[in-house]
Amino acid sequence: MVKPGDEFRVEYLDWTGGQIKNDDNANDIRDVDLTQVHYLSGPIGVEGAEPGDLMVVDILDVGVLKESEWGFTGLFAKENGGGFLTEHYPEANKACWDFHGIYASSRHIPGVEFAGIMHPGLIGCLPSKELLDEWNEREGGLVATAPDRVPPLATLPSEETAVMGRMKKDEAAAAAKEAARTVPPREHGGNCDIKNLSRGSRVFFPVYVKDGGLSMGDIHFSQGDGEITFCGAIEMAGYLDVRVGLVKGGMKNYNVKNPIFQPSPLE
């Protein structure tokens, strides 16, 4: 639990939880278990946060963990994740990147070196039960329009791999049947993949449950305008330094029903 005005650091695994290795073949990309992503840190409660408030999150710094100064970019196989260009590039592929301060270079893409803008791909607050039910109805209906599509139009709850925290037995089993996957962005924030959400950014998140439940992860060394290959950023383990605050009653007072992002001035 933190208080409004607190500044703190949160460390993160890469989004696959360490499934991808710093080597020269793409078998781990081909065989990655996508029911085990995204790995997030949280939820972090903010004292005094109540449904209807806005949580203000300032991103103060984003960095690389000293024990993991490398990252990766992947092309997922069409049969396991795919991407927006999967019809053109159906086979798995991978590039590993070494970090040198603000620069990245890859032995798999010789002659390329550039400065990255590090940012979290995924950040948001917990949904209410009512909002969770809305998501499952909406996304279940989408999948039902093309149930045999590869890759599927949405990722539905996975009972076998849902992370239930301290919940046990029957309670955990019931929750796993409706636990939201983290692939799409939604009304709470989530997997937004905004490349300029870096140092100097501010985000206003709607609060749907007591204490808010802020979670973050999927850290990128750099990214283009979206992730065309689904794993199209330079994925990494890392840390975020953030400051949190509250706007009491902000959802009603400012008619806010979704996150508001103020991008970083970094380009």
Q: Language-model features: where?
A:
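Intrinsically disordered, low-complexity linker/loop segments enriched in Gly/Pro
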Residues: 61-199, 204
